């Protein structure tokens, strides 16, 4: 497994059939890979580091941009040009809302994109 988030001890984890532990981010990446996603468009944020780790392990390319709206528009353009699902991954809060214009554009154009928004850790919710 990758080590980008080794310092993140407060992430969702689950046990696999063989008894090993897997993070929620790795589960997301496995699901993306199973659906044929080979590229994600994103702006790096702390709430989504585990997803990056999983994507690296699954061979999913990570395209890091300078604004979440750019990531959403890039996912839209990718979907239109390749016919594949475009995937935008944003961090929690403003990261999600910054992608809304690009997601709305894709929606109105019937472009197949998926927007995954991050969430703060469970301990921040006192769970």
Which ranges hold each PLM region?
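N-terminal alpha/beta PP-like core and its mobile active-site loop of ThDP/TPP-dependent enzymes
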Residues: 2-127
